[in-house]
A protein has these predicted regions:
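Conserved alpha/beta core of the MobA/IspD/sugar-nucleotide pyrophosphorylase nucleotidyltransferase superfamily
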Residues: 2-4, 180-184, 197-198
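Short loop/turn motifs at secondary-structure junctions
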Residues: 3, 49-51, 122, 151, ...
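Well-ordered alpha-helical segments embedded in enzymatic catalytic cores
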Residues: 37-40, 112-116, 187
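Conserved beta-strand segments of alpha/beta enzyme cores
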Residues: 28, 98-100, 184
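Mobile, glycine-enriched helix-loop/loop "lid" segments at the mouths of ligand-binding/catalytic clefts
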Residues: 77-78, 174-188
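N-terminal glycine-rich phosphate-binding loop and ensuing alpha1 helix
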Residues: 2-83, 140-143, 191-192
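Conserved beta-loop-beta/alpha segment of the NTase-like Rossmann-fold superfamily
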Residues: 73-76, 84-177
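Single conserved hydrophobic/aromatic residue that forms the stacking wall/gate
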Residues: 190-201
Length: 201
């Protein structure tokens, strides 16, 4: 079984749920304290053993490429002003992983975005991390899913339980307990008008 070393981060959405904040700034670049959301996601993937990352973008999101690239003028100024610690952080961004980008020319949904990664992933197993879904923890969520894949050899999805009231906003999986926090699920999705389960995708 091949090791999961690649990750796909769909980040081509319009960010309509967080307007007006995302009108001029991609939602993936909105800061959480001192880092943009997407940096947390890339760092999570790297901590889980991912070495190659494809970020799927669209027009108006080149700021993400700039964020993970070198910035010689800024780096020079930081060194000249004695800010070595900040300099190291800025330089490290360009070396977190092998990050490439592809543009989704039409915003046609998540499935289409992931299909744009076909040439990148080839026949290898890969992780999908949402560009605006930050999960913080000592043990990276992506790493937990990779371990589950390594144990089962099957596709793995991370889910969370939500309240009965919130379930209307999600699609749901029918799950059966397996062990610990692991569940098996059927391939059929429960229609959104049938809120009988509280484990959304």
């Amino acid at each position: 079984m091949k090791t999961v070393r690649k990750a796909v981060i769909p980040a081509a959405g319009l960010g309509t749920r967080v307007l007006p904040a995302s009108k001029a700034m991609p939602k993936e670049m909105l800061p959480i304290v001192d880092k943009p959301a997407i940096q947390f996601i890339v760092e999570e993937a790297v901590r889980a053993g991912i070495t190659d990352i494809l970020i799927i973008t669209n027009r108006g999101k080149s700021i993400m490429e700039d964020h993970f690239d070198r910035a010689p003028e800024l780096e020079e100024r930081l060194l000249a002003s004695g800010k070595k610690e900040v300099y190291d952080e800025v330089v490290n961004l360009a070396h977190l992983a092998n990050i490439t980008y592809i543009r989704q020319k039409e915003t046609r949904g998540l499935g289409h975005a992931i299909s744009c990664a076909k040439a990148f992933v080839g026949d290898e197993p890969f992780a999908v991390l949402y560009g605006d879904d930050v999960i913080l923890g000592e043990d990276p969520a992506c790493g937990q899913l990779i371990r589950a894949y390594n144990e089962t050899g099957k596709g793995v999805v991370g889910v969370k339980e939500v309240s009965e009231e919130a379930i209307q906003r999600y699609s749901s999986l029918k799950v059966e307990p397996l062990h610990d926090n692991w569940f098996t699920c059927t391939l059929s999705l429960i229609h959104i008008s049938e809120p009988t389960r509280r484990t959304p995708i």
